[in-house]
């Protein structure tokens, strides 16, 4: 709703009850930088807020708005079907780690940041699931806390209290296994816990007491990835899905590990040129007998 209220304020529009023309202008504004589905999400938020404020919005009578949404969907086509963000793969993770630990940050903060990054990657976490909304305040009912982490000898569990696909906050426990590599999330978490002074509040916090936020992760990834373009916090989740697919993991496993409610995870997977080359080579050298007939529908 903040986006909507700011938009109305900037253009001197009445926010409640919203007219069809106001919603058309707002939808056009959102569509200029986001997807059709996100436009619908923003409009749903406006509708919900209006109902709370006892303002009824006759969406079914807003025919021009309906036609606009159809037009946005058609005009975007598949141009937004693949996120533009670069996936962070294990090779890029190692570059990020090297640059992070060679930076001038406090050692305790480096260890904390690395623990957060590896946990996010191997846990397929969304940014909201492991960061705090603000630097100095948090909501204990939604923020990942220190007591949501359980460390064992060769594994760790992280309890996520709420997420995008868990609107009723049933919660889910993410299992991390030690992998005996330089990217091991369990080792990173154990190293972080060994030097962290407190055991309360958000799991990931800086030495000065401030909490790790989405903006922090975005800035850190951009500054440690050797100038890689289109890096963001979501690049970790995209990279995890792409890496799992490249390793040949079945789609049901990728969907389960990432907690996707549908097969939309496929749009996160990036297929490298090397993979396409190997597939092309394999197809060209495969000695399959010539079939007597071919049915493309079979």
Task: Go through the PLM ranges and name each one.
Residues 1-298:
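Extended, non-catalytic subsegments within catalytic or DNA/protein-binding/adaptor domains
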């Amino acid at each position: 709703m903040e986006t909507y209220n700011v938009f109305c304020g900037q253009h001197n529009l009445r926010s409640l009850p919203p007219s069809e023309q106001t919603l058309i202008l707002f939808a056009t504004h959102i569509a200029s930088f986001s997807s059709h589905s996100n436009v619908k999400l923003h409009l749903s938020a406006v509708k919900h807020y209006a109902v709370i404020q006892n303002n009824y919005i006759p969406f079914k009578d807003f025919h021009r708005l309906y036609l606009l949404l159809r037009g946005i969907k058609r005009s975007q086509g598949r141009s937004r079907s693949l996120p533009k963000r670069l996936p962070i793969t294990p090779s890029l993770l190692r570059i990020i780690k090297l640059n992070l630990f060679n930076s001038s940050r406090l050692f305790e903060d480096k260890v904390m940041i690395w623990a957060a990054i590896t946990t996010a990657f191997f846990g397929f976490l969304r940014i909201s699931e492991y960061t705090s909304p603000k630097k100095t305040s948090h909501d204990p009912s939604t923020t990942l806390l220190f007591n949501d982490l359980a460390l064992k000898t060769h594994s760790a569990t992280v309890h996520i209290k709420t997420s995008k696909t868990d609107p009723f906050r049933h919660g889910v426990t993410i299992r991390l296994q030690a992998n005996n590599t330089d990217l091991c999330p369990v080792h990173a978490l154990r190293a972080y816990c060994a030097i962290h002074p407190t055991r309360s509040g958000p799991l990931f916090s800086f030495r000065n007491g401030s909490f790790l936020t989405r903006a922090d992760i975005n800035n850190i990834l951009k500054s440690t990835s050797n100038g890689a373009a289109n890096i963001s916090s979501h690049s970790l989740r995209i990279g995890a899905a792409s890496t799992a697919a490249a390793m040949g993991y079945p789609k049901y496993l990728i969907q389960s590990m990432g907690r996707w409610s549908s097969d939309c995870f496929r749009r996160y997977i990036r297929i490298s040129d090397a993979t396409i080359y190997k597939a092309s080579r394999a197809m060209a050298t495969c000695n399959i007998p010539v079939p007597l007939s071919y049915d493309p529908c079979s």
